[in-house]
């Protein structure tokens, strides 16, 4: 499926995407009494109805996705229902209920974890090229209407380490083309490494990534630019908006009159307002947060509160990064949250930080269908999809973490599944 980006404005500003379709509601049916003389006709109608219901149920077991409308990545059977809390509809910026995207076509979004281009990854690029970094996962990234990751390092040759900071990343600029060639449409850069090489390094990174054809969210030349969304147009006409925010910053990283990152803390109302505005411009809103505590597999209360607030404001999918390990998934009011995807392209020294998943989410006006695809990241930071016992171990770990959050993942074959209807 060919994807069209909203490219008429970069981090210096971006115009509106498509308008959201109007609200609709399913019809209600009520059984009517019938006489003995009409029972034969009624029985025939009932049998036909049962046949239609069975056909619909069978079709629902398949997850539509991909740039050409193909099924979700193969590996198992049907999804299962999960828990979720009921609640009111999201409200618009004016305080009225936001219109439901009841007639929007479904879209598929693939989300991946922390991605950087320094240390072991930089050495790998020097030896094998940037495209080889994503060779093990690119087919999944390309299968969706949109794919995105958290870009955890500036991609620049500028060497200007931010003063007072103990860890500085400076990723190989060639990774920008690698991102685009792998099928990644959007990167979030709202994180605690975006300004590792100063404001000049940040602006150079944005320029390089956008020049490669990848949109950037969560950073910009000032606070207004850092809060701008990226918009991806699916070939079926649906529009997907992306926003990125961070709770984890170094002093001076926050965008203001000058370049920096978009922050969710301490004023979450700015995030909620941005989501509500975007919800009236696109069919689906996907939000990324850089948050939580490193190397812990349980979300803190602030993560849960912010994720729920984002969905209450109109987000359809919430993706978390920063802990460098997996945290569980949760269904809230029919929408999917994963609190941390861990690392995707990141060298590491521990088994836990090598375990991750790609989240393949099919969003529709009626709910979400999610497939989790297990990935293992090598010690030098290169990801590959895993099957068999290693893949199942990752899925079982996610299943346990998600159960603690009240959401059940079903494992079938080399994939895990979750499905929920919007509320």
Q: At which residue positions do the language-model features occur?
A:
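Acidic, metal/ion-coordinating pockets
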Residues: 2-34, 38-69, 75-77, 81-423
């Amino acid at each position: 499926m060919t994807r069209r980006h909203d490219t008429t404005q970069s981090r210096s500003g971006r115009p509106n995407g498509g308008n959201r379709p109007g609200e609709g509601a399913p019809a209600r049916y009520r059984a009517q009494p019938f006489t003995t003389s009409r029972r034969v006709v009624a029985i025939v109608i009932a049998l036909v109805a049962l046949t239609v219901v069975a056909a619909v149920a069978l079709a629902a077991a398949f997850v539509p996705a991909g740039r050409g409308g193909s099924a979700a990545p193969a590996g198992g059977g049907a999804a299962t229902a999960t828990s979720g809390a009921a609640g009111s509809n999201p409200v618009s910026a004016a305080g009225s209920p936001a219109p439901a995207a009841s007639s929007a076509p479904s879209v598929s979004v693939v989300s991946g974890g922390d991605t950087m281009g320094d240390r072991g990854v930089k050495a790998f690029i020097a030896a094998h090229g940037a495209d080889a970094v994503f060779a093990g996962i690119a087919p999944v990234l390309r299968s969706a209407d949109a794919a995105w990751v958290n870009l955890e390092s500036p991609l620049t040759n500028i060497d200007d380490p931010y003063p007072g900071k103990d860890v500085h990343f400076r990723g190989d600029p060639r990774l920008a083309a690698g991102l685009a060639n792998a099928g990644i449409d959007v990167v979030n850069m709202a994180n605690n490494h975006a300004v590792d090489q100063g404001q000049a390094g940040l602006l150079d990174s944005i320029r390089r990534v956008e020049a490669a054809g990848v949109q950037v969210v969560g950073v910009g030349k000032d606070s207004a630019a850092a809060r701008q969304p990226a918009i991806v147009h699916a070939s079926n006409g649906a529009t997907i908006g992306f926003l990125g925010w961070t709770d984890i910053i170094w002093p001076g990283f926050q965008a203001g009159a000058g370049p920096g990152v978009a922050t969710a803390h301490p004023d979450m109302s700015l995030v909620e307002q941005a989501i509500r505005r975007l919800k009236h411009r696109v069919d689906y809103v996907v939000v990324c947060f850089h948050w939580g505590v490193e190397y812990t597999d349980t979300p803190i209360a602030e993560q849960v509160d912010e994720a729920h607030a984002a969905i209450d404001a109109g987000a359809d999918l919430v993706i978390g990064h920063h802990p460098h390990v997996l945290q569980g998934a949760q269904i809230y009011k029919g929408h999917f949250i994963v609190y941390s995807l861990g690392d995707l392209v990141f060298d590491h020294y521990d088994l836990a930080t090598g375990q991750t998943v790609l989240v393949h989410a099919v969003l529709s006006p009626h709910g979400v269908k999610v497939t989790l695809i297990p990935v293992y990241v090598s010690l030098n930071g290169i990801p590959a999809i895993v099957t068999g016992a290693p893949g199942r171990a990752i899925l079982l770990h996610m299943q346990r973490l998600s159960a603690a959050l009240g959401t059940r993942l079903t494992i079938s074959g080399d994939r895990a599944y979750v499905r929920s209807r919007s509320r």
